[in-house]
Design a protein with these regions (language model features):
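Short, acidic loop-to-helix structural element flanking the phosphoryl-transfer center
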Residues: 58-106, 112-116
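Short, well-ordered alpha-helix to beta-strand connector turns
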Residues: 101-102, 129-130, 145-148, 164, ...
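Short amphipathic alpha-helix with an adjacent loop that forms part of the alpha/beta core around
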Residues: 141-144, 190-200
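Acidic, Mg2+-coordinating phosphoryl-transfer loop and its flanking beta/alpha structural elements
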Residues: 149-186
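Short acidic-hydrophobic, aromatic-tinged amphipathic segments that line or gate anion-handling sites
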Residues: 132-136, 181-189
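Substrate-recognition "cap/lid" segment bordering the active-site pocket of phosphatases
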Residues: 109-160
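Active-site neighborhood of HAD-like aspartate-dependent phosphohydrolases
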Residues: 1-67
């Protein structure tokens, strides 16, 4: 079986780092500026969805894109924390246990400078998986073609996946309302779920 493990939300706490970076570089930078014509940056917490424009106030979508992928991609995507303290120790151990009978790969929705930043993140944490598949909205079908099972926290992927593919939900605050057959709370639970799926 080919198993895709999503980077954002499953292995990397991307939303936490986005929140921290926005607070530091957008809100704190503008504190004390009394220009009536300047834009008021505002952070609406908690971040309970992947619709970032609902939580991070920018003048327009272009500014949000620039913040994520042009101005701070290494800060956000390269220097994020892992989702759990032992994420990569657990993932690497399961990779070693499963690699003789299953193919594990990292999949991630990335564009522009977030790709090299994500590679830095994976190397920083010592990820041993040999294959990484970057995709975007326009190339998402190529990601689905490479896997049979996807471990994801992304609500869109949990709800909209090809019928011949299985999804495993990694539980987060922004996907708790979505019901799936397979779900985990910790990355170390993945191996047991894969064994259950393989015997079905």
């Amino acid at each position: 079986m080919r198993i895709g493990v999503e980077l954002n939300g499953v292995l990397r706490n991307t939303l936490g780092k986005i929140e921290q970076t926005y607070q530091k570089y957008m809100i704190e930078k503008m504190e004390g500026v009394d220009d009536k014509n300047s834009f008021k940056y505002e952070l609406k917490l908690p971040i309970t969805s992947l619709e970032l424009s609902n939580h991070l106030m920018f003048e327009n979508e272009g500014d949000l894109y620039s913040f994520l992928y042009e101005e701070f991609p290494m800060e956000i995507f390269g220097h994020s924390q892992s989702t759990e303290y032992t994420t990569f120790n657990d993932l690497n151990e399961q990779y070693v246990n499963l690699r003789d009978s299953h193919d594990l790969l990292i999949v991630s929705d990335e564009i522009g400078k977030s790709k090299p930043s994500s590679l830095f993140f994976l190397s920083k944490f010592g990820c041993q998986l040999e294959k990484i598949k970057f995709y975007s909205n326009s190339t998402i079908n190529s990601m689905w073609n490479e896997i049979d099972v996807l471990l994801t926290a992304n609500p869109t992927l949990l709800l909209n996946h090809p019928e011949d593919k299985l999804v495993i939900k990694y539980e987060t605050i922004y996907n708790q309302e979505i019901n799936t057959i397979h779900k985990i709370k910790k990355i170390k639970e993945l191996e047991e779920i894969i064994k259950q799926i393989a015997t079905c």
